């Protein structure tokens, strides 16, 4: 390996050009930066003497992909001013595409409290790895499904595939399993158009979980945002395995949306390890108080500071990597309010401006989780176009309407119409409302109708973790086991919830497994359960519920009013009509105080009937000859073509002949 040359300041990270590797690292407060090269246990330290602005850089001739490296960054250790430099700590490149190994908690990883910790961390710190980004995409084309035709499917790579009997055991639980024909066929037959993957960025397990023998299964503890998580790979080449999977999904017409975490890092609070950003430029990367402590708006010990130009550049470059190098179609941003903090939230924050102006990111699907845990954190409806947003009002109101009956028909209608009172502003369209009943965070749909209370004891926190505001209803018996009458009522509730989800205006999101009744045994916070509790139970699938769900998605595609990218107009019968059980327009009283009965006529030809009452009720239908539309049973209670006898808490869809 030749002498270290000056190299160039851009792009950040390590980049192989066919003849050598360029290294570039941002640090505004460092006094010295050393590039550390590893050959087995042998470490060679090469000072980066070239500096352009705040970028330290060098070029290593003859270096090849697979080279293991890290950094030691020296400077002041003054926590009161936010400076925590410690050259005793080997640091990961924040732009690294791969890490060799896994972070196992060790006291030597700690950088120090009031004084720098003197122990060297190299022996216990996995290094970064140089990666060749070249890849033959074989003509891959992004599906670019219009938002108005999108059906999201939220899934965990391991959870979705680990127990699937049709996938070879050697690849179950990995990216390769997602690309297996059995899984591709399943997703296409179900009818979803986009796979929203829970985090696949390289993460680390919190020391607390490691001490209990648990893992951060969900992965919302990002360590290296540019790196494909190696724990989800079947091969020793995670990047290319992931790209193979993206290409296979695209060939099946399925988009790939990544759940990304840019609100905090795996370094946690002051008690956490010094692995990368803290030791490189703590004061630039993190939001700090006046005395140098970490803000905790994400509830994870630290908060990334996207208001800083260098941090913003880092995040935008990371998203560009995933989109342009890995061909992902979009992103869901975890605790996205933090991304717009200045420190108060602003819809015109630099991050949003950078996305809108970017050459390619502006065309991606962008989804915000529109809250964080700090004051002013709840920002539903406040994100700028072209963002869509997870709509927790849809989730909670639909649960309350169907399972508790404590909301009027008017609330159901507002949620059914893409929560227009929240999202219809500026240039935003109905698809901006991502409608959901469940997500990874909370009960599954099956558990929602089987448990009144969470059962999270396996998480090791005495059942204190996880929300208590579930709006669930066990139908009289706590737990999965119940008599047939109770089970029948639960099935009716699941069907009603799924119908209003998949036939509402907006963008529906289905949690993987809800389509066939998957359960997590009442655990509503399975973030640390990398085991059979959280993996999908394919062997227990309810085939009838699966057929019903896929039929609803097909029905959704056939209704023009649900495929349009514009808001419904009440005066346009080709959009929607809201009728009472007598087939007449609802009165103001009925909207807010009337019985829980409604007829929703869509595009003139389709009629969604809602009887959310505890008794059988007859509905007088609008003029026309009606029949029951699949996936609803042809034997459903259509009496004479003009009357529907609705069972308690039931829904049905009719189509005009």
UniProtKB/Swiss-Prot annotation:
SMART domains registered for this protein in UniProt: Aamy (SM00642)
Does the keyword Cytoplasm belong to this entry?
yes
The record's pH note reads:
Optimum pH is 7.
Which SUPFAM superfamilies does the record match to this protein?
(Trans)glycosidases, E set domains, Glycosyl hydrolase domain
The record ties this protein, via InterPro entries, to: GlgX_C, GlgX_Isoamylase_N_E_set, Glyco_hydro_13_cat_dom, Glyco_hydro_13_N, Glyco_hydro_b, Glycogen_debranch_bac, Glycogen_debranch_GlgX, Glycoside_hydrolase_SF
The UniProt site entry described as Transition state stabilizer is assigned to 441
Q: Name one GO biological process term.
A: glycogen catabolic process
The UniProt activity regulation field reads: Slightly activated by Ca(2+). Inhibited by divalent cations such as Zn(2+), Cu(2+), Fe(2+), Mg(2+), Mn(2+), but only slightly inhibited by EDTA.
Molecular function per GO: glycogen debranching enzyme activity; hydrolase activity, hydrolyzing O-glycosyl compounds
Q: Which residues form the active site?
A: 334, 369
Keyword Cytoplasm on entry: yes
Gene3D superfamilies, from UniProt?
A: Glycosidases, Golgi alpha-mannosidase II, Immunoglobulins
From the Swiss-Prot or TrEMBL record, state where the protein is found.
Cytoplasm
Q: How does activity depend on temperature?
A: Optimum temperature is 40 degrees Celsius.
Could you list the residue ranges forming a coiled coil in this record?
none
Q: Name one GO cellular component term.
A: cytoplasm
Cite the EC number.
3.2.1.196
Protein purpose? Removes maltotriose and maltotetraose chains that are attached by 1,6-alpha-linkage to the limit dextrin main chain, generating a debranched limit dextrin. Hydrolyzes the alpha-1,6-glycosidic linkages in amylopectin while does not hydrolyze the alpha-1,4-glycosidic linkages in amylose. Native glycogen is a poor substrate.
This chain's protein is named Glycogen debranching enzyme
Give the originating organism.
Dickeya chrysanthemi (Pectobacterium chrysanthemi)
């Amino acid at each position: 390996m030749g002498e270290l040359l000056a190299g160039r300041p851009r792009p950040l990270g390590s980049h192989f050009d066919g003849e050598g590797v360029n290294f570039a690292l941002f640090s505004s407060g460092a006094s010295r930066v050393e590039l550390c090269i590893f050959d087995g246990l042998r470490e060679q330290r090469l000072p980066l003497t070239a500096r352009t602005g705040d970028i330290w850089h060098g070029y290593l001739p003859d270096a090849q992909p697979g080279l293991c490296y890290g950094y030691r960054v020296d400077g002041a250790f003054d926590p009161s001013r936010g400076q925590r430099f410690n050259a005793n700590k080997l640091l990961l490149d924040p732009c690294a595409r791969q890490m060799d190994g896994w972070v196992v908690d060790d006291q030597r990883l700690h950088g120090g409290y009031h004084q720098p910790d003197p122990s060297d961390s190299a022996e216990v710190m996995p290094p970064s790895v140089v990666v060749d980004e070249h890849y033959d995409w074989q003509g891959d084309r992004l599906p670019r499904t219009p938002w108005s035709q999108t059906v999201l499917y939220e899934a965990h790579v391991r959870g979705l595939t680990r127990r699937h009997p049709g996938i070879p055991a050697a690849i179950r639980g990995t990216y390769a399993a997602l690309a297996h024909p059995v899984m591709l066929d399943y997703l296409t037959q179900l009818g979803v158009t986009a796979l929203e993957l829970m985090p696949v960025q390289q993460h680390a397990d919190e020391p607390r979980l490691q001490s209990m023998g648990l893992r951060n299964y969900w992965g919302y503890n990002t360590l290296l945002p540019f790196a494909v998580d190696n724990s989800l790979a079947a091969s020793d080449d995670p990047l290319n395995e992931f790209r193979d999977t993206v290409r296979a999904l695209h060939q099946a017409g399925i988009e790939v949306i990544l759940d990304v975490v840019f609100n905090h890092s795996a370094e946690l609070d002051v008690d956490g390890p010094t692995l990368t950003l803290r030791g490189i430029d703590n004061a630039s990367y993190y939001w700090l108080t006046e005395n140098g402590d970490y803000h905790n708006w994400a509830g994870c010990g630290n908060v990334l500071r996207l208001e800083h130009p260098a941090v913003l550049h880092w995040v935008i470059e990371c998203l560009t990597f995933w989109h342009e190098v890995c061909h992902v179609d979009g992103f869901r941003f975890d605790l996205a309010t933090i991304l717009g903090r200045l420190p108060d939230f602003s819809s015109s924050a630099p991050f949003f401006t950078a996305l809108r102006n970017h050459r390619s990111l502006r065309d991606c699907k962008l989804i915000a989780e529109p809250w964080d845990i700090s004051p002013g954190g709840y920002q539903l409806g406040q994100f700028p176009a072209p963002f869509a947003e997870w709509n927790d009002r849809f989730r909670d109101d639909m649960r309350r309407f169907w399972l508790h009956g404590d909301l009027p028909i008017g609330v159901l209608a507002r949620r059914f119409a893409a929560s227009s009172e929240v999202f219809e502003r500026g240039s935003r369209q109905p698809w901006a409302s991502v409608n959901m009943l469940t997500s990874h965070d909370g009960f599954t749909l099956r558990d929602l109708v089987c448990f009144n209370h969470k059962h999270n004891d396996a998480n090791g926190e005495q059942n204190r973790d996880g929300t208590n505001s579930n709006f669930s209803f066990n139908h009289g018996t706590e737990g999965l086991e119940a008599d047939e009458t109770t089970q029948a009522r639960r099935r009716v509730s699941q069907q009603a919830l799924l119908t209003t989800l998949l036939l509402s205006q907006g963008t529906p999101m289905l949690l993987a497994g809800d389509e066939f009744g998957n359960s997590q045994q009442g655990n509503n916070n399975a973030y640390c359960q990398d085991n059979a509790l959280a993996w999908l139970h394919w062997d227990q699938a309810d085939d009838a519920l699966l057929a019903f769900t896929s039929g609803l998605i097909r029905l959704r595609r056939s209704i023009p009013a649900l495929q349009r990218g514009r808001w419904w107009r009440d005066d346009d019968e080709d959009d929607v009509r809201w009728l009472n059980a007598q087939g007449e327009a609802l009165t103001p009283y009925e909207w807010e105080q009337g019985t829980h009965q409604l007829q929703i006529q869509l595009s003139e030809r389709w009629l969604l009937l809602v009887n959310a009452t505890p008794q059988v009720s007859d509905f007088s239908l609008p003029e026309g000859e009606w029949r029951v539309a699949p996936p609803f049973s042809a034997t459903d209670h259509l009496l004479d073509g003009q009357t529907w006898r609705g069972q308690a808490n039931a829904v049905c869809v009719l189509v005009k002949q």
